């Protein structure tokens, strides 16, 4: 495929074992898979054999942008990281914001593939066309924030840096990547950096991205900016006076992401789950509002540890301490001081450097519970999913999300947001708290039903008292989100399901295809773009099938969804959702009906064009999606019907 607009045109490949560099044309992947997750998946399919261990040097660590990256005004400069995750030893993904992805594109590369392992600790420098591996021994054991700042001082402030902390160097399974503006990526990819002996990737570029239709791009930029004006307010106990907006490169109007300026002067990003993971515990311990939650977030960023993994870990540690399964003496942790700065400093240091009991915790909560024994694993059975994360927007409340959790290799937060955020806004309004997250909250029952009809296939998908319409809704959400992850667009901004300026407050599902057409010159409509999303999703399904996630038997969710009644949901303690005809319906005290869930899977498989009895993909469907080569390979491995 000859690509002229929206792409840099090549993907950089680095063999860390040999120190060799090469490039491949982006066009050989972009015709079918567009960019981002799609292109990364095809590279992974081609090069990572199923039996390979995550820490094997031959595992690829793939950094990929999309065709909208570097084009201002669309919130399209996020970038995808993919590889075999050490958490479950299977394919997974993460995406990050900031400006690193755009800078890579300006340097002349749509993506970067790392393979092999360096003999000693190195960092990769990409300065326009000049690429070099350099000694990073002076960064050993240093934090991710500190390492980033050291490299920017050495190379110049125009460089953007992605790095990992000591947790990555010591291959902690929840180790993160940290880029500019404190953007972080999960799935344990910091540990893959450590396994490959690469500390950081510093990028500087001054190129430009050509667009196909400058006039159309300008008009779409203005249209999107007007539609998307909905100022979120993140609920926090910290001082609003110390916060300022922190906007990623090429954003539309900003989001809830802020930069916080604490009393000690060390400012940084404060956003979403990472902002609040220690807030309640700290306030309970100190009895007042402090900067400790922010410091806890920065500690995770600097050590390179996933805040969500730490949050679920702390719940387990607290329960085990109360049950006298774990003591302060045997763990070396001040468990009685959970919520204090001392506790979180000690916990994170021990995990990052694998000190004492920290070596056990570094393997993740699920493995740690099995190692500890003494029935410690029963204290995670009511909230934790297979990757060691919690389960926000869970299926006991939202039903649709059961299929999203069941068919993904990790918590699919982008997909969950498309369902959960409109429902949360509706619940805040229905519960009389209309201004908590969105000024002038207009999310009435009529609006959410109209959104459901336009985006999820039918109004009935917004009735959460029934399973009806949820299978179609799940499929449509996944197709849209996979196209979004290939463009790649920001989750806070896209899809634009609702707007304060339209007469009915409903957004437009065709916007993504309009923007893509204007930038790339690929004339496509909503159906065309959704087909790309469906193709990418099916490629991921094929990848996971080769890694022993084989259809219906693997499309499962945790047992607590069927057995433990729902107690509360974030921001929605009464668990209210839209019911029949938009009436208020509470799912508090409810569980997911197992038989209805399996029947919903039947319907979902049929919609997907897969075999209903096994959940395996079919040759007919894959060929219809232009994946005949994938179908042939799966057929040879007896993974196709």
Where are these regions (language model features)?
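Basic, polar low-complexity surface loops/patches
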Residues: 1-245, 302, 366
């Amino acid at each position: 495929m000859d690509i002229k607009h929206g792409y840099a045109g090549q993907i950089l490949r680095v063999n860390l074992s040999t120190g060799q560099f090469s490039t491949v044309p982006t066009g050989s992947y972009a015709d079918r898979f567009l960019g981002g997750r799609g292109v990364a998946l095809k590279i992974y399919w081609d090069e990572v054999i199923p039996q390979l261990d995550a820490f094997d040097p031959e595992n690829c660590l793939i950094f990929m942008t999309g065709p909208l990256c570097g084009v201002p005004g669309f919130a399209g400069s996020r970038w995808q990281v993919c590889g075999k995750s050490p958490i479950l030893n299977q394919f997974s993904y993460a995406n990050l914001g900031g400006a690193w992805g755009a800078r890579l594109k300006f340097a002349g590369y749509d993506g970067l593939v790392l393979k092999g392992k360096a003999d000693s600790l190195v960092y990769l420098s990409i300065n326009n066309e000049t690429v070099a591996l350099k000694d990073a021994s002076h960064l050993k054991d240093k934090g991710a924030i500190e390492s980033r700042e050291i490299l920017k001082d050495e190379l110049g402030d125009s460089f953007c840096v992605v790095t990992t902390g000591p947790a990555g160097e010591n291959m902690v399974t929840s180790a993160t990547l940290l880029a500019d503006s404190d953007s972080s990526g999960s799935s344990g990819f910091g540990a893959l950096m450590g396994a490959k002996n690469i500390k950081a990737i510093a990028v500087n570029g001054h190129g430009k991205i050509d667009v196909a239709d400058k006039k159309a791009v300008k008009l779409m930029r203005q249209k999107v900016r007007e539609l998307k004006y909905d100022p979120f307010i993140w609920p926090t106990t910290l001082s609003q006076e110390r916060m300022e907006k922190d906007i990623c490169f090429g954003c539309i109007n900003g989001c809830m992401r802020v930069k916080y300026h604490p009393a000690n002067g060390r400012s940084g990003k404060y956003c979403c789950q990472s902002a609040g993971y220690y807030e309640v515990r700290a306030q309970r311990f100190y009895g007042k509002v402090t900067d400790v939650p922010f410091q806890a977030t920065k500690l995770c960023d600097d050590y390179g540890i996933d805040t969500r993994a730490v949050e679920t870990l702390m719940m387990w540690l607290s329960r085990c301490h109360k049950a006298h399964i774990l003591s302060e003496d045997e763990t070396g942790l001040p468990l009685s001081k959970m919520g204090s700065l001392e506790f979180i400093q000690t916990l994170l240091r021990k995990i990052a450097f694998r000190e004492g009991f920290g070596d056990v915790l570094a393997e993740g909560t699920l493995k740690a519970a099995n190692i500890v024994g003494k029935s410690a694993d029963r204290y995670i059975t009511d909230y934790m999913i297979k990757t060691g994360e919690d389960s926000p927007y869970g299926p006991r409340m939202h039903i649709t999300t059961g299929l999203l959790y069941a068919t993904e290799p990790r918590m699919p937060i982008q997909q969950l947001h498309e369902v959960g955020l409109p429902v949360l806004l509706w619940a805040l309004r229905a519960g009389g708290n209309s201004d908590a997250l969105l000024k002038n909250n207009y999310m009435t029952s009529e609006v959410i039903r109209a959104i459901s009809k336009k985006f999820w296939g039918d109004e009935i998908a917004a009735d959460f008292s029934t399973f009806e319409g949820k299978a179609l809704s799940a499929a449509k959400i996944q197709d849209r989100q996979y196209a979004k992850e290939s463009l790649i667009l920001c989750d806070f901004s896209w899809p634009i399901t609702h707007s304060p300026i339209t007469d009915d407050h409903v957004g437009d599902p065709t916007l993504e295809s309009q923007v893509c057409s204007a930038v790339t010159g690929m004339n496509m409509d909503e159906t065309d773009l959704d087909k790309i999303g469906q193709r990418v999703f099916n490629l991921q399904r094929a990848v996971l099938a080769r890694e022993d996630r084989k259809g219906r038997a693997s499309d499962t969710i945790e047992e607590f969804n069927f057995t433990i009644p729902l107690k509360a949901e974030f921001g929605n303690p009464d668990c209210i959702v839209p019911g029949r005809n938009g009436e208020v319906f509470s799912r508090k005290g409810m569980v997911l009906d197992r038989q209805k869930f399996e029947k919903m899977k039947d319907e979902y498989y049929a919609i997907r064009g897969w075999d209903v009895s096994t959940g395996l993909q079919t040759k007919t469907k894959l060929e219809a999606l232009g994946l005949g080569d994938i179908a042939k390979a799966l057929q040879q491995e007896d993974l196709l019907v």
